[in-house]
Amino acid sequence: MAKKSQIAKQKRGAKFNVQNYTRCERCGRPHSVYRKFHLCRICLRDLAHKGQIPGMKKASW
């Protein structure tokens, strides 16, 4: 419930731009969110393993 209320609070918009922060669009996690994908590292990895992110592949060297 706390996560849902925080997401709803964020959608209303902050009084100042500095107060805005990124959240994962898939799970709502506030930490470690990649701006380019709007996903947290956990969801990004999961979708990459499933092959649902075009052009992303596992690094090998």
Swiss-Prot record:
Q: Name one GO cellular component term.
A: small ribosomal subunit
**Entry cofactors:** Zn(2+)
Q: Where does Zn(2+) bind?
A: C24, C27, C40, C43
The biological processes this protein is annotated with in GO are: translation
- GO molecular-function annotation terms? rRNA binding; structural constituent of ribosome; zinc ion binding
The answer on whether this UniProt entry bears the keyword RNA-binding reads yes
Q: How is the cofactor bound?
A: Binds 1 zinc ion per subunit.
UniProt entry tagged with the keyword Transmembrane: no
Matching Pfam families: Ribosomal_S14
Which InterPro entries does the record associate with it? Ribosomal_uS14 (IPR001209), Ribosomal_uS14_bact (IPR023053), Ribosomal_uS14_CS (IPR018271), Ribosomal_uS14_sf (IPR043140)
Q: Which UniProt keyword terms apply here?
A: Metal-binding, Ribonucleoprotein, Ribosomal protein, RNA-binding, rRNA-binding, Zinc
By sequence similarity, the record places it as follows: Belongs to the universal ribosomal protein uS14 family. Zinc-binding uS14 subfamily.
Task: Describe the task this protein carries out.
Answer: Binds 16S rRNA, required for the assembly of 30S particles and may also be responsible for determining the conformation of the 16S rRNA at the A site.
Subunit relationships = Part of the 30S ribosomal subunit. Contacts proteins S3 and S10.
This protein is called what?
Answer: Small ribosomal subunit protein uS14B
Q: What is the lineage of its organism?
A: Bacteria, Bacillati, Bacillota, Bacilli, Lactobacillales
